[in-house]
């Protein structure tokens, strides 16, 4: 997370076949929806610009978390109240912490807008 926003996010997956539970909180977001995505690279030397595009090993179209055809990194939006920490609570069955398409070592980006 770059800029005035900061936070901690946890990824938990019990087995390679289980969904990933994403929990945590982000501070400093403006009121409204903010895109929440895993990007391709774990490089933040130049802020989010160094993180590359959304993680998309299947070369699919951008989509919502419930879409069958979507970037693996498309985890939807989080809703910020603007005056308090923003909770992150996502369960996703497409991302994984195992194997070649693991998100481990990649960058989580919270976008300014949805």
Swiss-Prot record:
It catalyses: 2 superoxide + 2 H(+) = H2O2 + O2. Residues 59-73 have a biased composition (Basic and acidic residues). Its main location: cytoplasm. Binds 1 copper ion per subunit. Binds 1 zinc ion per subunit. It is an enzyme of class 1 (oxidoreductase). GO terms for cellular component: cytoplasm. Keywords: Antioxidant, Copper, Cytoplasm, Metal-binding, Oxidoreductase, Zinc. Pfam families: Sod_Cu. Zn(2+) binds at residues 54, 62, 71, 74. Its cofactor is Cu cation; Zn(2+). Residues 54-80 are annotated as: Disordered. GO terms for molecular function: copper ion binding; superoxide dismutase activity. It is found in: Cytoplasm. Its EC number is 1.15.1.1. Cu cation binds at residues 37, 39, 54, 111. Destroys radicals which are normally produced within the cells and which are toxic to biological systems. Homodimer. Belongs to the Cu-Zn superoxide dismutase family. This is Superoxide dismutase [Cu-Zn]. It comes from Drosophila tolteca (Fruit fly).
